[in-house]
Amino acid sequence: MSIDDLKSKIPDFAKDVRLNLSSMASDETLTPQQKYGLFVACGIASRNADVRKALVAEAAGKVDASVIQAAKAAASIMGMNNVYYRFVHLASNKDYRTMPARLRMNVISNPGVDKIDFELWSLAVSAINGCGMCIDAHEDVLRKANVTAEAIQAAVRFASIIQSAAIALEAADTE
């Protein structure tokens, strides 16, 4: 399955989603590694099998297998961190902010790819998962590494398009 296959599954009520998928596929704001890593990480974070399969297939052959593995790791580790740190951020009891997380997250310091690319993928997944604390932390690392606002915005735009594709497919499944 490819992005074109995925677009063909998007119903007419979500025509804008199809058009956004096309724009995303041809977007050259990011490096290929950043772009296809986002496809994989956000496809997994969408929790939709069709979206995940299409975007992983789209990335295969365009980037090294290590990029795909690292993007999978970003989605996985953010699945954990986003839940934990969203709780810490939203809980009225501020004591949780001073407690050690006691969560293993070694992959963040050694992702097997460029750390900035991994941060970009982590930011996008954090946007999908709605963790403001994680969004701020990853955006801060990216800005300190001189990543442009346009690149950061592109990553979050990709995340929003990918999530909307998953929702469109779920909505179509109700018909």
Curated annotation (Swiss-Prot):
State the encoding gene.
ahpD
* Paired cysteines (S-S): C131-C134
What EC identifiers does the entry list?
1.11.1.28
What is known about what this protein does?
Answer: Antioxidant protein with alkyl hydroperoxidase activity. Required for the reduction of the AhpC active site cysteine residues and for the regeneration of the AhpC enzyme activity.
Which family does the record assign? Belongs to the AhpD family.
Q: Which UniProt keywords apply?
A: Antioxidant, Disulfide bond, Oxidoreductase, Peroxidase, Redox-active center
| One Pfam entry name | CMD
In Swiss-Prot or TrEMBL terms, this protein is called Alkyl hydroperoxide reductase AhpD
